[in-house]
Amino acid sequence: MSDYGDVTVDSLNNVKCEFGQGFHFLLDAHLDEIGMIVKSITDDGFIKVDKCGGIDCRMLLASEVSVWGKEEIKGIISNLPPHLQKKGDSKKVPSFDEISIDVGMTKEEAQKVISLGDRVTFKRNFTQLAGTQISSSVLDDRSGVASIILALDELKKINAKFTILFSSQEELGLRGAKAASFGVNPDEAISVDVSFGYTPMCKKSDCGEIGKGPMIGISPILDSKMSNDIKLTAEKYNIPYQIEVMGGGHTGTNADVLTVNEKGIKTALISIPEKYMHSPVEVVDTADVENTASLIVAYVKERVGEINA
């Protein structure tokens, strides 16, 4: 991002880029991902772990992972063959106490390259599906990061100030955005994340649809005028969109902490619909990513034009 402005990385590994002058927009998406942390190495050489972020234990067994020790160590989360399972085992969801990673090493070999506290991530399994849909781990929220990057060339042309924040530790309690937005004092903020994409396993009323455009958040904690103006902008520029209504006092995204940072920030939320969230096989439609970028640019242009009118 150094082609666009001054780039800094803080002590929490938040990446920030600032450029331009005028009405000040903060655009946020988080860089971090769910994963695990090494707790111990058994006498048999298996790696015991605990979770970092909201991991669904149902999808862990037989997953391919990388342990980030002194070097990248490939591993498999061990599972019990069906032939050896007892009655009821097939319906049981394992706890993290029962989870272990097989790296094919003895304890002595593992201890030379793996330390307690090393991080564990899921294997990057990028797959092109039909049309413009893709599958991979970490699309939550690298797809949001990608949408902001796609918007940068056009944003650079607009007479406004921008702080681009690619935040850390969203999956651990929104910690990165809370720290990194302190002292920025933007006029408005837009957080870009993912939200639930429909599959036959969930209710349509709870989800957006893949390929039908970005989801504009409506919530008591989000700025209602911003949300409505983003919707009107999408209609004006013929950008497909969906409405996501979130009750209660939270959205589960960085928008929650941006709204109450310092004196408060007017904040909107745009989400990319995603299937199989928090799994190694998350799915998004690249058309939704591109339309999210287009919507950000269009809204900023409209807002700056309104201010300068």
Describe the residue ranges of each PLM region:
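N-terminal hydrophobic/helix-forming segments and targeting peptides
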Residues: M1-A309
